[in-house]
């Protein structure tokens, strides 16, 4: 159930540690169990939630008889949904320091069988493309070390028998409830056993536990279907809609919105935005979203990021006045943020140069001319949360688009000692979740839409906070068919943001009839970015 490195199992392992004496051996033996009603929760992390009538929790305690290290395997059983969740708590009961080098959330073995697996690869503007490959002898893996779950591999996969299709065949699905760096591995060994492991990517991970300290892994959602991919997808759709998404928007019809980005980019004033909103209101559009460029010195993507103060000179009015004008048209008002990033040319960077993620003595690697803000630091989290809440309090804002337009490299935090730099990537994610939770606790009626250069962070972890995510920056109707098809294997249509966009399309140049563009996004959240 939870394989360990260094004591005779030579396949891919779920747990690898460095003991105080430098050895990496762990032998886990059964030490007890506990069964309870309801569903366990995980401190600081998103997870499936359910009450005592909907779920049971099984906890299996394992202990190393030599060192005293304890591992609690947690299972959440939602029987009516054919769902099992898994998570792990590692507790240092030894007499010395233990460093976790790998702590996966699950390990699953098939003792026999000939399997394939479905994974969902991609790139910017073409996310979650279905790929079906045999599980051959040896190791296969997907993952991300980009600081986020990424455009390139999604955290959902399916292991299936070879003849499985939409309506028949045996298949097993796994969805990682996390938004950061991850690794999902399969291995077929010399006697045709197959193993699947999923968890935080170990390449960027080393977590120190002093005696008495513990570490909680993120959660994995598991399901099985003997009726093909369709039934498996329905299981995941239901658990995400009802037991991951939260708040008043999880089952509520989302407003049809218009976003000014492709219509204006950075070139707008308050009057121009109101003009667009007025035309949209006459067509029945319900929400106007002001995108990038409303704050600081932000007339292009080279400056101003991090300075979350409205640029009243550019807008020609205060944020409240603009919001009131939009609301006066019978629409709701929304706004764009990218809180995890910072421009070198910004007041925030000049005031707090140590808040940017960069390695001392090295020139930082910029992407989209911007750096990452160190969300592993509590002072950074507190500052950003205060700024977000201040902006939200200043105007009638009903919706936030939360963007994240680059991957993380140069991973280093000035707040961590050298021996704890391997904790930075996961602490960053814990910080992000803390800020999101704080913002939504202060503004529970807010509709939050996730975005990461399009669909670069489309995962169950983010859906715990944002019930919809912008599916892709590719708004071409024909290419969206493939993107939305791949996404639908693991995620319900209610979570996918889609556009009726302008033609010729800004990504492909294709001219597609309005009826086609409308039909492609009809089942999804349906905005229009046109001017």
State the predicted function of each range.
Residues 207-226:
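Short Pro-Gly-centered flexible turn/kink motifs
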Residues 361-500, 505:
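Active-site neighborhood of glycoside hydrolase catalytic domains
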Residues 11-14, 18-32, 36, 169, ...:
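Glycine-rich, aromatic-flanked loop segments that form ligand/cofactor-binding clefts
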Residues 251-383, 399:
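Aromatic-lined carbohydrate-binding/catalytic grooves of carbohydrate-active enzymes
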Residues 524-531:
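Conserved small/polar residues in nucleotide/adenosyl-binding loops
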Residues 88, 212, 326, 448, ...:
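Conserved, mostly hydrophobic/aromatic
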């Amino acid at each position: 159930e939870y394989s360990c490195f260094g004591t005779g199992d030579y396949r891919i392992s779920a747990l690898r540690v460095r003991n105080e004496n430098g050895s990496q051996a762990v032998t886990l033996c059964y030490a007890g169990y506990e069964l309870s009603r309801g569903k366990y929760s995980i401190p600081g992390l998103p997870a499936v939630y359910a009450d005592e009538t909907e779920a049971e929790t099984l906890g299996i305690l394992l202990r190393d008889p030599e060192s005293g290290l304890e591992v609690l395997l947690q299972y959440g059983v939602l029987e009516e949904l054919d769902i099992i969740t898994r998570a792990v708590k590692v507790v240092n009961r030894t007499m010395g320091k233990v460093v976790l080098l790998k702590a996966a959330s699950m390990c699953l073995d098939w003792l026999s069988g000939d399997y394939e697996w479905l994974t969902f690869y991609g790139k910017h503007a073409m996310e979650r493309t279905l790929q079906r490959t045999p599980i051959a002898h040896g190791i296969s893996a997907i993952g991300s070390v980009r600081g986020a779950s990424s455009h390139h591999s999604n955290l959902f996969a399916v292991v299936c028998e070879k003849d499985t299709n939409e309506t028949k065949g045996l298949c097993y699905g796994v969805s990682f409830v996390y938004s950061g760096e991850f690794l999902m591995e399969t291995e077929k060994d010399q006697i045709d056993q197959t193993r699947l492991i999923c968890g935080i990517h170990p390449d960027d991970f080393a977590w120190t536990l002093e005696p008495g300290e513990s570490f909680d892994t993120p959660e994995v959602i598991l399901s099985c279907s003997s009726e093909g991919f369709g039934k498996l997808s329905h299981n995941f759709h239901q658990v995400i809609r009802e037991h991951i998404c939260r708040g008043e928007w999880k089952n509520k019809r989302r407003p049809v919105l218009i976003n000014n980005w492709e219509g204006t980019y950075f070139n707008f004033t308050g009057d121009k935005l109101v003009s667009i909103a007025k035309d949209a209101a006459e067509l029945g559009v319900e929400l106007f979203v002001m995108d990038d460029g409303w704050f600081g010195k932000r007339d292009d993507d080279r400056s101003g990021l991090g300075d979350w103060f409205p640029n009243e000179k550019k807008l020609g009015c205060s944020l409240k006045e603009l919001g009131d004008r939009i609301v006066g048209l019978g629409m709701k008002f929304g706004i764009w943020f990218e809180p995890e990033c910072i421009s070198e040319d910004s007041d925030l960077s000049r005031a707090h140069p140590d808040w940017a993620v960069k390695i001392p003595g090295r020139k930082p690697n910029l992407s989209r001319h911007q750096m990452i803000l160190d969300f592993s630091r509590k002072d950074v989290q507190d500052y950003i949360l205060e700024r977000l809440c201040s902006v939200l309090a200043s105007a009638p804002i009903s919706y936030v688009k939360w963007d994240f337009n680059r991957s993380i490299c140069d991973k280093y935090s000035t707040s961590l000692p050298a021996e704890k730099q391997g904790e930075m990537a996961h602490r960053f994610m814990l910080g992000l979740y803390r800020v999101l939770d704080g913002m939504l606790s202060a503004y529970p009626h807010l509709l939050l839409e996730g975005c990461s250069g399009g669909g670069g962070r489309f995962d169950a972890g983010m859906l715990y906070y944002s019930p919809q995510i912008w599916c892709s920056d590719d708004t071409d109707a024909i290419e969206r068919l493939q993107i939305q098809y791949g996404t639908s294997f693991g995620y319900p249509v209610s979570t996918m943001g889609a556009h009726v966009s302008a033609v010729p399309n800004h990504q492909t140049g294709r001219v597609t009839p309005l009826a086609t563009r409308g039909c492609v996004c009809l089942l999804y959240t349906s905005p229009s970015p046109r001017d």
